[in-house]
Amino acid sequence: MSLEDADALRVLRDAFAPCDAGRPGDSGDLVHRFYTHWFALDPSVRDLFPPEMGAQRVAFGHALHWVYGELVARRAQEPVAFLAQLGRDHRKYGVLPRHYQTLGRALLATLRSHLDAAWTDAVEDAARTSLNLITGVMSGAADADEGPAWWDGTVIGHLRVSRDLAVVRLRLDQPMPYHPGQYVNVQVPQCPRRWRYLSPAIPADPGCGIEFHVRLVPGGLVSTAIVNETRPGDRWRLSSPHGGLRVDRDGGDVLMVAGSTGLAPLRALIM
């Protein structure tokens, strides 16, 4: 039955339920043990992730809970599209096809141990089939994408406009096609492997320019480094663009409201 067995898929979905969802078990412990197992099985994977894994574990658990929920409801189109985008985006981390193989093995073993008595033949069949689907879609989408895995660029300007706000301009090594209102994941040299989302404040530039507005977040390592420590000549790495924020230019008047650096994507749209 595998992916047709809603009861077996429901067991897998509930294993990843958020801890505050009123369900038995501890998905946080499951995900923590999965990463521990994966890093032991394939030590090369550890260097792809940031030192602090808390946010990564939460995001991974939420993603799998949603994917399995969609499979229970027999809605495959959105999960497949989501996993394909995830696979394409993971190229920026240096993820290789063999990493997906070890991920599937580690997650299957961790689920078997975590579910204990609930691990039946039907659940194992559903787990194997679903994990093959998840890793296969991600790996296949990554292989099929002919675009750059990332864009590198050099900081050419850093303007400290206030105590906690900076405008950073870069010259990319090659043009990045994106739509105004989209956002990218950014890695700065002061904080390796700690990626943060930023919205370009200008439309895509054929001349390879790009601009970001960054406000210092108290306690935030990356925003503090960008505002306080970024200098011309620094090399940044950017992911492929995500999301979409569009204006119907054939419609009526539009009122745009933004606060702080939230103005950046609106500025790009207006420009």
Question: What do these predicted regions represent?
Answer:
Residues M1-W151:
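Core of compact, soluble alpha-helical bundle domains
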